[in-house]
């Protein structure tokens, strides 16, 4: 579900621009109560001007013309129009579905393509195909299809001459990408992929395996590139009860490209093997929801790719376009954890974000990741890097801030070591004693290390995952060369294929279950405690939970305000292919709420985040919001209240 503060802020800023420019209405609504524009303006001859719209920066053309089909006659008129504002927030409203396709389709109307002194219309069949695919997403939030994406009015048939506005995004195979005939269906092209090529491969893969895969965007980079994710699940696009969620992230540093390519290959492999009936892959996709983000830093990658492969790109492109190191840009919750851990009776998990964090420079890529992990109940994660050959795990920040190297374990040290070993133990190069190692030689440690014991730093993504959410994340250094040459990519994939699959299967280690009241109603945000491990997980909105646990006997407790706590003993075997099912039924207290350990937000009110991205726990399931009450507006209408008098009433169904 989209976040109200973020969208209101964005729309408020755009509304200020509208008031300052005070343009005339972009079109006359006419007598139609829907507020649709009644006149179309498409000229065959026009004066082409450079395209200067941030939302349309990645369009497949560089020139447009005025007036536009919606009668906009200046950049100010376009940028202050409700149509343009919708394109800026549609990603959030639809939770990443159909983007960037939908945004680029809208750009083709708001800023028509102009070449050689002539405007060109987008193709009708492209619009019709996208509408068919995306209409369910609009229906899910009770939003009408935007009038300016009317396929019959604003788009041209092929016989009249038109262009595909999505060609650069998901177009046909390039000549150099075309696969030779006779190749097996598992063929993967082991080469570096540009941003456009990466998106095309992911979208083609999702289309090929549409029953178990889909793509979506979690946000945009500083330069406007969508952060595209491909997910695999038996029901893609939705969380299934008690199905664990796992994510793999590559290219957080733009010049560390091995993880980017490996995840692109993994997506194709999962799709192909599923279609071929591979029982291991089918079991994995039918019991797990897997999210792959090959490139968290596409802007930095472009800088590194321009310099080329090899050691010469050791630092070029590491940061994002704002010159920020994204793996140092997350809130420093580890320092707060060390402070809390010294106090008995205070929770040290789900630590809120300090308001001071937002006073600094926070990258849009970082914000996108934070919103993502606050929205989806991830259980397990790995961040893929390059430059060494080792698997590290939290904490990454030393418990003594003056020590650059100091063993600093989490309460889940045993589990994190198991996760790290699940990757390293089946990686042939990490276990090869004859291999010349790069950087530090971690073979004596089993090619795993506590992050702070390697080198200490703050603002890392792994520590943030663990201390702010239920998610356990490790960091994998895939090899010595950050930007390997193409001839090394096949070997890189072969070395990491089995470790990746083995790691994904680790999400099923431990226990899972439901927490309900005596009537069977789910208890959301209930706490799952394990005696001897000072780190709790919480239930999702539907009452389901997952708790990664090492082998052994554990006392597990479920509790929630207003209910009596329930305690159970569980035994985790050395080997297990699926998590043990442990349900809890909580009974209400007869004498009022019991005193529980205070959470960090109650113990530390100064750490409440004024710009906090709401988590999934803050929202009812989307199906509960689908139908507005009689006479009321849909929940998303509040996002557009700042646009008076030009509210987009054409988005209302009622």
UniProtKB/Swiss-Prot annotation:
Inhibited by 2-mercaptomethyl-3-guanidinoethylthiopropanoic acid (MGTA) and guanidinoethylmercaptosuccinic acid (GEMSA). Inhibited by chelating agents such as EDTA and EGTA. SMART domains: FRI, Zn_pept. One of its GO terms (biological process) is protein processing. It is an enzyme of class 3 (hydrolase). Glycans are attached at residues 62, 286. The active site is at 477 (proton donor/acceptor). Gene3D superfamilies: Carboxypeptidase-like, regulatory domain, Frizzled cysteine-rich domain, Zn peptidases. One of its GO terms (molecular function) is zinc ion binding. Residues 596-630 are annotated as: Disordered. Its cofactor is Zn(2+). Residues 191-507 form the Peptidase M14 domain. Its EC number is 3.4.17.-. It is found in: Secreted, Extracellular space, Extracellular matrix. InterPro entries: CarboxyPept-like_regulatory, Frizzled_dom, Frizzled_dom_sf, M14_CPZ_CPD, Peptidase_M14, Peptidase_M14_domain. Residues 43-165 form the FZ domain. One of its GO terms (cellular component) is extracellular region. Keywords: Carboxypeptidase, Disulfide bond, Extracellular matrix, Glycoprotein, Hydrolase, Metal-binding, Metalloprotease, Protease, Secreted, Signal, Wnt signaling pathway, Zinc. Its main location: secreted. Zn(2+) binds at residues 253, 256, 385. Disulfide bonds join 48-114, 56-107, 98-134, 123-162, 127-151. CDD domains: M14_CPZ, Peptidase_M14NE-CP-C_like. Belongs to the peptidase M14 family. Cleaves substrates with C-terminal arginine residues. Probably modulates the Wnt signaling pathway, by cleaving some undefined protein. May play a role in cleavage during prohormone processing. This is Carboxypeptidase Z.
């Amino acid at each position: 579900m989209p976040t109200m503060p973020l969208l209101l802020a964005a729309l408020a800023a755009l509304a200020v621009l509208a008031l300052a420019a005070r343009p005339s209405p972009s079109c006359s609504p006419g007598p139609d109560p829907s507020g649709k524009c009644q006149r179309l303006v498409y000229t065959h001859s026009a004066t082409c001007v450079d395209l200067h719209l941030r939302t349309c920066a990645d369009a497949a053309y560089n020139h447009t013309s005025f007036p536009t089909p919606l009668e906009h006659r200046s950049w100010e008129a376009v940028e202050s129009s409700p149509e343009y504002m919708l394109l800026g927030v549609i990603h959030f409203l639809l939770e990443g579905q159909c983007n960037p396709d939908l945004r680029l389709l809208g750009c083709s109307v708001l800023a028509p393509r102009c070449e050689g002194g002539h405007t060109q219309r987008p193709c009708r069949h492209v619009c019709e195909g996208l509408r068919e695919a995306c209409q369910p997403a609009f229906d899910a939030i009770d939003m009408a299809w935007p009038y300016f994406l009317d396929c019959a009015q604003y788009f041209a048939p092929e016989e009249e001459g038109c262009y595909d506005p999505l060609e650069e995004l998901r177009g046909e195979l390039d000549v150099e990408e075309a696969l030779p005939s006779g190749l097996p269906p598992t063929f993967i092209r082991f080469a570096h992929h540009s941003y456009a090529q990466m998106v095309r491969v992911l979208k083609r893969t999702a289309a090929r395996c549409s029953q178990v895969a889909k793509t979506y965007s979690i946000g945009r980079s500083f330069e406007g590139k969508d952060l595209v994710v491909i997910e695999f699940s038996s029901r893609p696009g939705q969380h299934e009860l008690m199905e664990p969620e796992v994510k793999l992230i590559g290219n957080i540093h733009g010049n560390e490209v091995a993880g980017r390519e490996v995840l692109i290959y993994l997506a194709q492999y999962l799709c192909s093997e599923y279609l071929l009936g591979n029982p291991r892959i089918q079991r994995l996709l039918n019991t797990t929801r897997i999210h792959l983000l090959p490139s968290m830093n596409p802007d930095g990658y472009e800088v590194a790719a321009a310099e080329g492969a090899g050691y010469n790109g050791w630092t070029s492109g590491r940061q994002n376009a704002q010159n920020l190191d994204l793996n140092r840009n997350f809130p420093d919750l580890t320092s707060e954890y060390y402070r809390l851990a010294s106090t008995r009776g205070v929770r040290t998990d789900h630590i809120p974000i300090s308001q001071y964090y937002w006073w600094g420079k926070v990258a849009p890529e970082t914000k996108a990741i934070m919103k993502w992990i606050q929205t989806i109940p991830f259980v397990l994660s790995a961040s893929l890097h390059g430059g060494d050959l080792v698997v590290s795990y939290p904490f990454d920040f030393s418990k003594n801030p003056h020590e650059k190297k100091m063993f600093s374990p989490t309460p889940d040290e045993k589990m994190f070591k198991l996760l790290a070993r699940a990757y390293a133990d089946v990686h042939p190069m990490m276990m090869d004693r004859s291999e010349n190692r790069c950087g530090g030689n971690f073979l004596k440690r089993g090619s795993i290390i506590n992050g702070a014991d390697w080198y200490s730093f703050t603002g890392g993504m792994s520590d943030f995952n663990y201390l702010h959410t239920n998610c356990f994340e490790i960091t994998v250094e895939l090899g010595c060369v950050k930007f390997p040459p193409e001839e090394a990519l096949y070997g890189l994939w072969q070395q990491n294929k089995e470790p990746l699959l083995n790691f994904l299967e680790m999400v099923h280690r431990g226990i899972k279950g439901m927490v309900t009241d005596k009537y069977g109603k789910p208890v959301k945000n209930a706490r799952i405690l394990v005696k001897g491990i000072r780190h709790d997980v919480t239930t999702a909105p539907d009452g389901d939970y997952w708790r990664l646990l090492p082998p052994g006997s554990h006392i597990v407790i479920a509790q929630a305000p207003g209910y009596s706590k329930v305690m159970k003993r569980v035994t985790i075997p050395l080997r297990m292919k699926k998590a043990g099912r442990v349900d809890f039924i909580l009974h209400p207290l007869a004498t009022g709420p019991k005193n529980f350990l205070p959470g960090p937000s109650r113990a530390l009110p100064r750490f409440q985040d004024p710009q906090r991205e709401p988590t999934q726990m803050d929202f009812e399931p989307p199906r509960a919001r689908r139908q507005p009450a009689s006479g009321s507006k849909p929940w998303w209408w509040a996002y557009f209240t700042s646009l008076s008098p030009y509210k987009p009433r054409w988005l209302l169904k009622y």
